[in-house]
From Swiss-Prot:
This is Ras-related protein Rab-8B. GTP binds at residues 17-23, 35, 39-40, 66, 121-122, 124, 152-153. GO terms for cellular component: endosome; endosome membrane; phagocytic vesicle; phagocytic vesicle membrane; plasma membrane; synaptic vesicle; trans-Golgi network transport vesicle. GO terms for molecular function: GDP binding; GTP binding; GTPase activity. Switch 1, switch 2 and the interswitch regions are characteristic of Rab GTPases and mediate the interactions with Rab downstream effectors. The switch regions undergo conformational changes upon nucleotide binding which drives interaction with specific sets of effector proteins, with most effectors only binding to GTP-bound Rab. Residues 205-207 form a propeptide. Gene3D superfamilies: P-loop containing nucleotide triphosphate hydrolases (3.40.50.300). It catalyses: GTP + H2O = GDP + phosphate + H(+). GO terms for biological process: endocytic recycling; exocytosis; protein transport. A lipid is attached at C204 (S-geranylgeranyl cysteine). SMART domains: ARF, RAB, RAN, RAS, RHO.
Length: 207
C-alpha cells in the first residue's frame, strides 16, 4: 500500500500534570475541547497530516503524563522525537518554574538536535495569570528556544505552534539533505520559507 504522506514527524508534549497538554492535542488533532480534566495515564498519541510547502507531513504527536510516577515511562519516548513542545500553564507559576527541569530531561534523554518550543497555555485566562508573557519570552531566549502563548480552549495559536515546530523540523531536514548532497548534482529540491518573517506569532489578548 502506497504511503499517503511524504514525511513522518514524531512530536512530544511534555510538562507538568494539568497544564493542558491533552487539551492542546485534542484541539489540534480534532478541533475539540473537553472541559473535564482527565489526567493522562502513561502516554497516548494522536495523528494529524498537514501540508507544508507542497509536502504532506504526518504528525505523530505523543501526549505524556506529567506525574513523577510516570517519568520512567515517558522518558523512553524522548528517543526518536524530532520535536518537543514544553507546556506550562500561565495561571500556575510552579508549572513554569518546572520547565527548566523538563529541559534538563530533554538534554538527558532526547536527541541533541531535537527541535524545541516553550508554550504557555491557557492564555484565555488572563485574569488569573501568574506568569507574564515577558518571563516566558526571557526563558525561551535564555535556552535558545522558540516561545508562544496559546489557548486550547479558544484555539488561539494552537495551529501556529504545531505548524511552526513542524516547519522548523522540515527546515532542519532539508538543510541536512542539502549538506549530504552538496557534492553531487541533482540534489533535493530546496524547501523555502513562504513567509518573509521567521515566525509570525500572535499576541494572546482577551477581546
Amino acid at each position: 500500500m502506497a504511503k499517503t504522506y511524504d514525511y513522518l514527524f514524531k512530536l512530544l508534549l511534555i510538562g507538568d500534570s494539568g497544564v493542558g497538554k491533552t487539551c492542546l492535542l485534542f484541539r489540534f488533532s480534532e478541533d475539540a475541547f473537553n472541559t473535564t480534566f482527565i489526567s493522562t495515564i502513561g502516554i497516548d498519541f494522536k495523528i494529524r497530516t498537514i501540508e507544508l510547502d507542497g509536502k504532506k507531513i504526518k504528525l505523530q504527536i505523543w501526549d505524556t503524563a506529567g506525574q513523577e510516577r510516570f517519568r520512567t515511562i515517558t522518558t523512553a519516548y524522548y528517543r526518536g522525537a524530532m520535536g518537543i513542545m514544553l507546556v506550562y500553564d500561565i495561571t500556575n507559576e510552579k508549572s513554569f518554574d518546572n520547565i527548566k527541569n523538563w529541559i534538563r530531561n530533554i538534554e538527558e534523554h532526547a536527541s541533541s538536535d531535537v527541535e524545541r518550543m516553550i508554550l504557555g497555555n491557557k492564555c484565555d485566562m488572563n485574569d488569573k495569570r501568574q506568569v507574564s508573557k515577558e518571563r516566558g519570552e526571557k526563558l525561551a531566549i535564555d535556552y535558545g528556544i522558540k516561545f508562544l502563548e496559546a489557548s486550547a480552549k479558544s484555539s488561539m495559536n494552537v495551529e501556529e505552534a504545531f505548524f511552526t515546530l513542524a516547519r522548523d523540523i522540515m527546515t532542519k531536514l532539508n538543510r541536512k539533505m542539502n549538506d549530504s548532497n552538496s557534492s553531487g548534482a541533482g540534489g533535493p529540491v530546496k524547501i523555502t520559507e513562504n513567509r518573509s518573517k521567521k515566525t509570525s506569532f500572535f499576541r494572546c489578548l482577551l477581546l
